[in-house]
């Protein structure tokens, strides 16, 4: 274990960086404030939180069904609580242009979730794509699913359209544009008589079993022998809750393992002299990069926290503090083996 104490704090203050071999927990202290054969997939995945936490959706980056002629030469990933930005450089090593359909499938979101959930509508409104510095307007596709009695998922998009729901209404679990009760009433009237035949999980309250997945798509041509730059950005979907020390984060518990929370950080969070009582979580599906024919040529990860916060994540010794609030890691020939889970701890406002 290597400890790096900032020169302007004493031993009773927080360490600015704490990195262990193979895993790292980084934190700091400051002023409190609060895409024709092989599709390219920009993949996302959903993560569920405990009942007393706000659920969040862990979004991701490009996944490629291996085309031996196209390589990802570079990926720059920036993560903060306000924005996720990703920039890619793809090289077509063949003598012919290759056109792919690029997809960004979002996770499923249930129509029956409670209000304590991430800002999915905000994510939809913030999603932007550029190819070689030109804005891309993707097509939007929606699929709807129900859970069956045997625990499997049934694609019920066509059935719901027969019930009179439009694509826009099918997206409601994501966009929250329509009153849930009215959509639920429409589904109940249409589907309840068919529930047994459809083998839905329950014959009752069918309106609350529907979940929606949105998929963005666009055509992208990778010029022969050329490099294509693709960028996308969005507001991350955050979750969070309150800490009740000393019970959280429990030593060796799920939170400590998921975010590689060091003993120093755990003790700091449990110390009554400090007021780090709220936390924010986000996830990023990094392992999609492992689906490429070759490793990522050059990978850069930048994580930024707000002043006054602590941040912890699992990474190796390459993650370094480059400013009071920014941490960065650089890798060559990078093949990600696990996804990113990041947690930010914030100080309470004075009472």
Predicted segments, located by residue:
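Sec-dependent signal peptide recognition
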Residues: 34-40
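Single conserved hydrophobic/aromatic residue that forms the stacking wall/gate
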Residues: 1-13
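N-terminal signal peptide c-region/cleavage motif recognized by signal peptidases
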Residues: 45-47
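Short, Lys/Arg-enriched N-terminal segments with co-localized hydrophobic residues
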Residues: 10-13, 17-32
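Lumenal/extracellular ectodomains and adaptor appendage modules
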Residues: 49-351
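Residue-level detector of alpha-helix boundary/anchor positions
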Residues: 25, 40-42
């Amino acid at each position: 274990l290597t400890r790096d104490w900032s020169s302007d704090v004493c031993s009773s203050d927080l360490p600015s960086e704490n990195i262990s071999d193979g895993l790292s927990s980084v934190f700091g202290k400051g002023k409190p404030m609060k895409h024709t054969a092989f599709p390219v997939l920009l993949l996302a995945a959903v993560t569920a939180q405990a009942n007393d936490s706000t659920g969040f959706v862990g979004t991701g980056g490009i996944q490629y069904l291996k085309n031996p002629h196209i390589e990802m030469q570079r990926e720059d990933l920036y993560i903060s609580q306000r924005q996720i930005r990703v920039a890619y450089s793809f090289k077509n090593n063949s003598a012919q242009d290759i056109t792919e359909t690029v997809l960004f499938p979002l996770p499923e979101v249930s129509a029956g979730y409670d209000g304590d959930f991430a800002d999915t509508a905000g994510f939809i409104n913030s999603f932007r794509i550029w190819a070689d510095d030109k804005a891309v307007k993707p097509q939007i596709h929606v699929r709807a699913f129900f859970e069956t009695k045997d625990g499997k998922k049934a694609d019920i998009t066509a059935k719901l359209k027969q019930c009179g729901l439009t694509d826009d209404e099918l997206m409601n679990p994501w966009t929250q544009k329509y009153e849930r009760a009215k959509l639920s009433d429409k589904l109940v009237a249409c589907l309840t008589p068919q529930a047994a035949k459809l083998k839905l999980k329950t014959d009752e309250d069918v309106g609350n079993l529907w979940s929606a997945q949105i998929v963005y798509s666009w055509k992208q041509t990778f010029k022969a022998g050329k490099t294509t730059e693709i960028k996308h950005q969005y507001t991350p979907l955050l979750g969070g809750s309150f800490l009740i020390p000393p019970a959280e984060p429990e030593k060796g518990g799920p939170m400590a393992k998921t975010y590689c929370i060091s003993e120093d950080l755990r003790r700091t969070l449990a110390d009554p002299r400090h007021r780090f009582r709220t936390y924010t979580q986000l996830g990023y599906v990094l392992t999609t990069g492992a689906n490429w024919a070759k490793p990522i040529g050059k990978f850069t990860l930048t994580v930024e926290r707000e002043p006054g916060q602590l941040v912890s994540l699992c990474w190796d010794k390459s993650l370094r503090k480059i400013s009071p609030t920014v941490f960065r890691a650089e890798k060559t020939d990078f093949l990600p083996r696990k996804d990113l889970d990041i947690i930010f701890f914030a100080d309470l406002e004075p009472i």
